[in-house]
Amino acid sequence: AIADGTSMITENVFEARFRFVEEMIRLGADARTDGHHAVVRGIPQLSSAPVWSSDIRAGAGLVLAGLVADGETEVHDVFHIDRGYPLFVENLVSLGAEIERVSS
């Protein structure tokens, strides 16, 4: 979402995969979905917000979006990420990310 231009993404297998777009919009993304397609327009900056992960990829994407957003972003339901990306937080910290896992 932080980029110039417009991108169109097509999902031919699992239409519900775009559920995370609503969460990206909470962060300020300029995005919309229509069936099997999502259109994302680049913006200069995302804002912090609480967001909820609906699956593995969505969770990882929301964490990465939160890292570049202004302010502090809370990503809920991160257990989805654990199923596919072991040591996700630790790996991001080793790359210099300012991220913390907090128990609910």
From Swiss-Prot:
Chain residues that bind UDP-N-acetyl-alpha-D-glucosamine: 13
One example of a Gene Ontology biological process annotation: cell division
Pfam families xref list: EPSP_synthase
The protein's enzyme class: transferase
Broad class of where this protein is predominantly found: cytoplasm
EC numbers on record: 2.5.1.7
GO molecular function term, any single one: UDP-N-acetylglucosamine 1-carboxyvinyltransferase activity
Keywords: Cell cycle, Cell division, Cell shape, Cell wall biogenesis/degradation, Cytoplasm, Peptidoglycan synthesis, Transferase
Top-level taxon in the UniProt lineage: Bacteria
Record pathway: Cell wall biogenesis; peptidoglycan biosynthesis
InterPro entries in the record: Enolpyruvate_Tfrase_dom, Enolpyruvate_Tfrase_sf, MurA_subfamily, RNA3'P_cycl/enolpyr_Trfase_a/b
SUPFAM superfamilies: EPT/RTPC-like
Subcellular location: Cytoplasm
GO cellular component: cytoplasm
Catalytic activity entry: phosphoenolpyruvate + UDP-N-acetyl-alpha-D-glucosamine = UDP-N-acetyl-3-O-(1-carboxyvinyl)-alpha-D-glucosamine + phosphate
Family named by the database record: Belongs to the EPSP synthase family. MurA subfamily.
Function: Cell wall formation. Adds enolpyruvyl to UDP-N-acetylglucosamine.
Name of the protein in its database record: UDP-N-acetylglucosamine 1-carboxyvinyltransferase
